[in-house]
């Protein structure tokens, strides 16, 4: 059957599998890239605040 110009084509099972695979890879990247980066940023902020607010011990 001919596809009408304005309508999107129906998703095939192959397209669905590819989309699921892409979503799985995106989730994998979140755990391997985003979380460690976020942890480093939080750690840097904590260290900066600690250094900035510690009492001076110069005599």
From Swiss-Prot:
InterPro entries: DUF4519
Main location: membrane
Compositionally biased spans, kind Basic and acidic residues: 9-22
Region spans: Disordered: 1-25
Signal peptide per UniProt: none
Compartment(s) where it occurs, according to its Swiss-Prot or TrEMBL record: Membrane
Coiled coil: 9-31
Keywords: Coiled coil, Membrane, Transmembrane, Transmembrane helix
Spans traversing the lipid bilayer: 32-52
Gene Ontology cellular component annotations, sorted alphabetically: membrane
Record's bilayer topology term: Single-pass membrane protein
Sequence similarity: Belongs to the SMCO4 family.
Name of the molecule in the record: Single-pass membrane and coiled-coil domain-containing protein 4
């Amino acid at each position: 059957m001919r596809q009408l110009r304005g309508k999107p084509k129906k998703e095939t099972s192959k397209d669905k599998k590819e989309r699921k695979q892409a979503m799985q890879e995106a989730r994998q990247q979140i755990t391997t890239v985003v979380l460690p980066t976020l942890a480093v940023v939080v750690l840097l902020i904590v260290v900066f605040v600690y250094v900035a607010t510690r009492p001076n011990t110069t005599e």
